[in-house]
């Protein structure tokens, strides 16, 4: 997809992806990345960040930082996710990430769904992080950035094990959340966070979006540690 657009003179082509959409704690991180034509073949092992080992992600992160034509990373904190709702926050993060690229893209590839208002022609690519190098690069940037943030949050809130599950709805995280109740880094737009808070007589410390469906943690959001 990216190489076809480059050959037609529609570049530079930027990819956009996120990390943390399914998590019930921590920020949503969105990255945009434009690569030079042919970079996908030169970045050995570049693919969807979720199928890479942590060491492989770190290696590719450094390569992308050094060699990308342009990149940007946007961090949307938990309180903003609560205020906007996760889907709106995701769309807004993608718009911000593309807008902050130092090189205006000729085309933007998004992973799986259409994003209006990107300021350039765009197309949604199913499994884009597996088939488009620029989307894969964006996924690595977002994932590594978010994992580092969650490791830092573990130092502040060690009882939750953020360094292990990275804020996703694992059985271990759910057990810790039930035992201790949520902290300020949890997202109150998730049903499991609200349920744990009620056990401890806690109320949301901030305004939470009431858009339909945003209080549900979907089955697809529940993952094993091995998938993170």
UniProtKB/Swiss-Prot annotation:
Keywords: Cytoplasm, Endonuclease, Hydrolase, Manganese, Metal-binding, Nuclease. Its main location: cytoplasm. Its cofactor is Mn(2+); Mg(2+). InterPro entries: RNase_HII, RNase_HII/HIII, RNase_HII/HIII_dom, RNaseH-like_sf, RNaseH_sf. Manganese or magnesium. Binds 1 divalent metal ion per monomer in the absence of substrate. May bind a second metal ion after substrate binding. Residues 11-202 form the RNase H type-2 domain. A divalent metal cation binds at residues 17-18, 111. Its EC number is 3.1.26.4. This is Ribonuclease HII. It comes from Saccharopolyspora erythraea (strain ATCC 11635 / DSM 40517 / JCM 4748 / NBRC 13426 / NCIMB 8594 / NRRL 2338). The gene is rnhB.
